[in-house]
Amino acid sequence: ISTKATFPMGKDVNAYGSSRFHLIEACENSLRRLNTDHIDVYHMHGFDGSTPVEETLRALDDLVTSGKVRYIACSNFSGWHLMKSLSIAEKYGWSKYISHQVYYSLLNREFEWELMPLGIDQKIGTMVWSPLASGRLSGKYRRNSAIPEKSRIAAGTSTVPKDAAPEERLYAIVDVLDEISRETDKSVAQIALNWLLQRPTVSSIIVGARTE
């Protein structure tokens, strides 16, 4: 069981962020909504620059000590955000982030520049979100073809910006995936996902699904 905190859950000033007040309240609310007595991995959805890192980590360590949270993780941190958090946790003997959730795909590989080496060095696992680049690597997007009408990109709700990479780069990648697909009898999406699962530090990928 995994869930997140930090992003707004209401309009009140204490209904968002990574302050001690909000994290403890958010955890209790999540436990109630999930109808469970513990959270296996509790993610900070983003770095809260308005709250001292010490306050955030102490609150999370208290949640771990209480048994309500087993492990803590973070999401969308920069390299210095993550390294500062790990350093402070080590200094005080508090629980450390065991995993970092990031955007990473064959189309966008910036994760490899800094965060992957950091993960290797500090033994931090990686959970990848949008591994198919908001569907761009699903096999539905083809050179000289229209964007699928019901796609998130067409609707403007994609978590990966439309200009995340030049179109020619996308189609060049898809062309190669098509070749491998024919050779292996696997889908373009399967190949793109399998590539990610073989990458250093990647322990899990998050695949979205339609609700229809």
Q: Where are the language model's segments positioned?
A:
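A short, structured active-site edge motif that brings together acidic residues
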Residues: 1-9, 100-102
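Outer-envelope exported proteins of Gram-negative bacteria
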Residues: 2, 41-43, 74
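Short, small-residue-rich loop/turn micro-motifs
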Residues: 3-5, 38, 46, 130, ...
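Active-site mouth loops of central-metabolism enzymes
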Residues: 9-24, 45-51
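Short, acidic/polar
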Residues: 17-35, 58, 82-87
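Residues in well-ordered alpha-helical elements
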Residues: 21, 37-40, 54, 189
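Active-site groove signature of glycoside hydrolases
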Residues: 31-52
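Beta/alpha (TIM)-barrel catalytic core signal, keyed to glycine-rich beta->alpha loops juxtaposed to Asp/Glu
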Residues: 51-212
